[in-house]
């Protein structure tokens, strides 16, 4: 049995080739992992209403076409794997907003995502992207305790105390990343894990290799372009080449795609602030503040806006 866990089997079932590939991951998130249309829409940068309609249409087509939901054979797993990895990552990402670990459901979802990644790693040990995903989740989870101060305030990565990071998770992540690299088949999750690995080095060296991070984001946007990667690349290049360079990269992103993407406005606001463009920075901060439901992040952005 290639897939020993029932939830993993159901995830692969949702990636049936007769189903619209764009709906594979959303269906997994809703039907197997229990996310609602709001959380799924947030992950895919669309409104909850639009995502709900897409899910409803997909289910209607499944019923009308009488698609048989069967466990895939071992030789069918590779072509369904990417959607499953995306679903596990999106499930973990939906828990990331609960930085303080106060929401039991969010904590449970993060734990389940990491557990599923470990089970999948054991089931497909020679697939480097599975190990890359696990390494990425472990690196992120290692920093969760440092994302909130004792008073509940939001602490950005650059200001976190690395001594609070969970060393056992970082060590496990590094082992997974090393094994994945030995396969010499680079993929999106391995690059993202490598970026987090560079950040984790600060716990050992006291510094962050910003040029390396910028280079990895260059690779990521070429291999797996996305709005999130493009915004993060702009922020990374700003750290190396200055705010103007970062802003130029932000300006290359399609404006329509980032209208409701909060990280874009937060990065843009900070870069404009560094360039002493006070009015434009204030407007961007206001957009970023209006797009977050997290009180701690809102307070953090308000404080930045007042600088």
Predicted regions, residues:
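TPR/TPR-like (Sel1-like) alpha-helical repeat modules
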Residues: 278-296
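Alpha-helical junction/boundary sensor with strong preference for TPR arrays
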Residues: 117, 124, 184, 217, ...
């Amino acid at each position: 049995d290639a897939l020993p866990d029932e939830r993993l089997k159901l995830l692969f079932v949702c990636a049936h080739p007769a189903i619209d590939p764009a709906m594979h991951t959303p269906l997994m998130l809703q039907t197997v992992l229990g996310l609602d249309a709001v959380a799924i829409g947030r992950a895919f940068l669309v409104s909850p209403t639009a995502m709900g309609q897409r899910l409803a249409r997909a289910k209607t087509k499944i019923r009308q076409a009488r698609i048989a939901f069967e466990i895939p054979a071992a030789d069918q797993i590779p072509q369904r794997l990417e959607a499953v990895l995306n679903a596990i990552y999106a499930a973990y990402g939906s828990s990331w907003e609960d930085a303080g670990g106060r929401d039991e459901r969010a904590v449970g979802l993060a734990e389940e995502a990491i557990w599923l990644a470990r089970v999948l790693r054991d089931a497909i040990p020679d697939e480097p992207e599975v190990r890359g995903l696990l390494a990425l989740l472990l690196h992120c989870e290692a920093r969760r305790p440092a994302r909130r101060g004792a008073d509940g305030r939001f602490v950005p990565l650059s200001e976190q105390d690395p001594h609070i990071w969970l060393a056992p998770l970082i060590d496990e992540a590094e082992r997974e990343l090393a094994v994945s690299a030995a396969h010499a088949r680079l993929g999106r999750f391995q690059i993202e894990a490598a970026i987090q690995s560079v950040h984790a080095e600060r716990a050992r060296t006291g510094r962050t290799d910003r040029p390396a991070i910028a280079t990895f984001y260059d690779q990521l946007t070429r291999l797996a372009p996305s709005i999130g990667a493009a915004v993060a690349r702009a922020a990374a290049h700003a750290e190396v080449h200055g705010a103007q360079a970062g802003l130029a990269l932000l300006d290359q992103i399609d404006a329509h795609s980032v209208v409701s993407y909060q990280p874009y406005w937060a990065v843009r606001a900070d870069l404009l602030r560094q360039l002493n463009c006070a009015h434009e920075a204030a407007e961007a901060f206001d957009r970023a503040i209006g797009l977050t439901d997290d009180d701690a992040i809102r307070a953090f952005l308000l404080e930045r806006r007042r600088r």
